[in-house]
A protein has these predicted regions:
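Basic, nucleic-acid-interacting segments
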Residues: 1-185
Length: 185
């Protein structure tokens, strides 16, 4: 239902694979994922901006995979919460059409409304039922810059603030002729 609501092509066939990697929040050492053959692809969601314009955000893919554990940093120690490990999740990936924190926030808000309307998910960000990971890359020309990923944002405000901060950080670095390092924050 989500794929249809987001104007996606629905795959007639899909498969799940093991995605092997070591990370402390992945106790099995692999994750089950539809990454190679997503259930949905080539969709879009139109969002209404504050100035009244409508912008189309293209959706590359929607696929199912297992959630991982959660790293919790407390008093100089890192703990791992495995309560959500193995729980199925839907991952949605967009094309690089989002150009501002406002557009990202509007996209997430509209997606949340659709998921709730379809009764696919309560999509409560504060409960971890919907999380956002943003990739920010700035460039002085048409070529995409080096991306920095910010993971597990759990509110519209954190999406907005994280993007604004990262745009400012990368702008200052580029203005000072510093290299942007690809990283996850």
């Amino acid at each position: 239902m989500t794929g249809l609501a987001l104007n996606c092509e629905i795959a007639p066939q899909t498969k799940f694979d093991r995605k092997n990697y070591f990370y402390p929040d992945l106790p099995k050492g692999y994750q089950i994922s539809q990454y190679d053959m997503p259930i949905c692809k080539n969709g879009y969601l139109d969002i209404k901006l504050d100035n009244g314009d409508t912008k189309r955000i293209r959706i590359t893919r929607i696929h199912m995979e297992e959630d991982t554990g959660k790293l919790v940093h407390v008093k100089g120690k890192t703990l791992v919460d495995y309560n959500r490990a193995g729980v199925p999740l839907m991952e949605l990936v967009t094309e690089p059409d989002i150009n501002s924190s406002e557009e990202a926030k509007k996209f997430c808000q509209e997606l949340q409304l659709i998921l709730r309307y379809l009764d696919v998910s309560a999509a409560n960000m504060e409960k971890g039922q919907m999380r956002c990971e943003v990739n920010i890359s700035l460039s002085k020309n048409e070529k995409l810059g080096t991306k920095v990923e910010i993971k597990n944002l759990n509110s519209f405000k954190s999406v907005e603030r994280s993007i604004e901060y990262e745009i400012k950080r990368q702008t200052e670095a580029l203005d000072n002729k510093q290299e942007i390092i690809q990283e996850t924050r």
